[in-house]
């Protein structure tokens, strides 16, 4: 195996483990994003006690005063995602927590990205009405059966997802990793599986030719004002406009963020698993779709162990869910 193939396989393994890779560059010149100016990140926690009651907080905001919601709030300058989560839970509910895993990422473009965690209580005590402030009125454990006026019903599916993961995890524990990035982008783990009755499945990965590091690199797409997920479709339209293919964003393999230097490291890099499928009737599927640009190339994954891991993650859906709302 040559050194380039070895580096690529090592990097792919890191991404599959959720470790992330240093963010190097994007092809175009893009201004850095700034938290609470042109990007907004929200953290929320799903926390259960031993009775599988879920932690809820009573809102103090005028527009939803007295209603109940999961502990959640906006990230602040110089915070990591985990620090923001722990601060919000402490301020709103009075307890300390430790994240177990990211449970879901939701987005409406870079101006609204929400990170939902499954977490556990590690200390402190539930906030009481005597401690009410601008953050919340009180906190308590909800059995999910007793009537409770909710601020919004979107949290019910989040609570269900937390219970499901507690009982039967369907993707590996995923925590944000500390790598600085100046934009909101995706590193695409973009795959194509060619299947033939007379041969084993073959797996292909899209690789970038815009490479200043001289090492094999996965494509990176930047999101501006529109949905983050649309950046994937745009890349496909640009490099395979004549192909009849469907694009399936399977989910997130890793989240990279630093945030220590306001206006310079407020970006996020999502390592996103994508599957392309040929939809043309009678199409030859022994090879991936033809590329109509020199910016990218297909590379076959020939390491059998690595190929098996990737195909398993694709077919099992064993990735952090990613929702565009």
Swiss-Prot record:
Disulfide bridge partners, by residue number: none
Organism: Danio rerio
CDD domains membership: NUDIX_8DGDPP_Nudt18
Gene responsible for this protein: nudt18
Essential cofactor(s): Mn(2+); Mg(2+)
EC number in record: 3.6.1.58
Binding site for Mg(2+): 55
Motif Nudix box in this chain: 73-94
Domain Nudix hydrolase residues, every copy: 38-163
Biological process terms in GO annotation: dADP catabolic process; dGDP catabolic process; GDP catabolic process
A Pfam family this chain is assigned to: NUDIX
Family: Belongs to the Nudix hydrolase family.
PROSITE patterns: NUDIX (PS51462), NUDIX_BOX (PS00893)
InterPro entries: NUDIX_hydrolase-like_dom_sf, NUDIX_hydrolase_CS, NUDIX_hydrolase_dom, NUDT18_NUDIX
Transport keyword on record: no
Role: Mediates the hydrolysis of oxidized nucleoside diphosphate derivatives. Hydrolyzes 8-oxo-7,8-dihydroguanine (8-oxo-Gua)-containing deoxyribo- and ribonucleoside diphosphates to the monophosphates. Hydrolyzes 8-oxo-dGDP and 8-oxo-GDP with the same efficiencies. Also hydrolyzes 8-OH-dADP and 2-OH-dADP. Exhibited no or minimal hydrolysis activity against 8-oxo-dGTP, 8-oxo-GTP, dGTP, GTP, dGDP and GDP. Probably removes oxidized guanine nucleotides from both the DNA and RNA precursor pools.
Catalytic activity: 8-oxo-dGDP + H2O = 8-oxo-dGMP + phosphate + H(+); 8-oxo-dADP + H2O = 8-oxo-dAMP + phosphate + H(+); 2-oxo-dADP + H2O = 2-oxo-dAMP + phosphate + H(+); 8-oxo-GDP + H2O = 8-oxo-GMP + phosphate + H(+)
Source organism superkingdom: Eukaryota
UniProt keyword annotations, A-Z: Hydrolase, Magnesium, Manganese, Metal-binding, Nucleotide metabolism
Organism classification: Eukaryota, Metazoa, Chordata, Craniata, Vertebrata
Protein name: 8-oxo-dGDP phosphatase NUDT18
One Gene Ontology term of the molecular function aspect: 8-oxo-GDP phosphatase activity
